[in-house]
DNA sequence: GGCCATTAGTGCACAGAGTGCAGTTTAATT
DNA sequence: AATTAAACTGCACTCTGTGCACTAATGGCC
């Protein structure tokens, strides 16, 4: 182990992270006020106090402003899965990883983004496209835990089912807003699937 | 019943369909030759013998050129599911609908498009986003078959699982190109899921 | 402190996707 | 033949995203 992982985080790194956060917040506010399509990158840049050109040093695209915060969350999931117990069924490992990382899930921001996506089918599609990254992260984690090549298809299958369960849970959670806690929705969705599936490992 | 459904298909309608097909073929050829990103709509229009502006009377966007042919296929699936037997488990109805419509699935075009998407992650994402339409179509079909509101969540769950199985099947089929028939891949994927799932209906 | 490499940040010009609009041509209907 | 709707074109425009050349700020190092 080389120097563990704390990393002192330099001033520059911190500034960057904070500005990244700032731009995201400004953007979400503008999206909520005027709609996603009607908000141009020029406006976002102006309201954030930077040049339009410089936006692309923080986000690769307009969509990324909404979805990039999920990237590190997905990465955490992958790592958490990789640290799971190989004796358990794959789905159970994923379930535990999701539930144990739920505290780090930014529910408030997700709710705001869901509001922005409402009535914008193009954005919903992009959101869906982004979910492929969750599935890939799950698969990556599972493949680390069970590196043998012959189990790859089984793990792919498990990652598809898992991300399906998560999507189902999120859907219920967003629909019955505030009626259920996200953790319960996720637990229910996995329960439902685990109950119906005889996970033969 | 008013006039049934045969519809004589007027000359105009037919011309439109043929031109639609023609543009698609031209585009796929260009995409294969020069890549998706490097092929502009202006080139496609020129090679198709129409104006760039007029392309948008056939396709809403560049992506649509690749994905629109799936639209009517998905619609067939939905109708086929809606005609299923309500006594069977939902997953079984979907499985039968997929398998019985497989002859109408344009495998050749799908292979070409898969080739185009290879090494283009943005396009893969868009492809993934498009799959939400299959899931919606499945859910639509199932909801027609079981219109009672209280089973909606169960049907949503089934549509997520089904489209997951289809995606798994397609993945295997594309990976082991020509090694297995698509029908077998689909059957296997559903078998696998139906075997592992105790479909309690 | 002063030098230096790196990173933050700007401005400009450009390409390509997609839209609105005003207009012309073509084809089906009566 | 006249009418009407659809096919089709051209133009000007907006917005996203990129390449490039450039300046400003910052951290490390002597």
Specify the residue positions occupied by each region the protein language model found:
Chain A
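C-terminal peripheral helix-coil segments that are non-catalytic and often amphipathic
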Residues: 1-6, 140, 178-201
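Short hydrophobic/aromatic patch on the recognition helix
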Residues: 50-59
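A secondary-structure capping/hinge motif
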Residues: 63-65
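Hydrophobic alpha-helical connector segments
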Residues: 75-115
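Short secondary-structure transition hinges
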Residues: 108-137, 148
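Hydrophobic alpha-helical bundle segments that form small-molecule/ligand-binding pockets
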Residues: 133-158
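Amphipathic C-terminal alpha-helical segment
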Residues: 155-179, 195-201
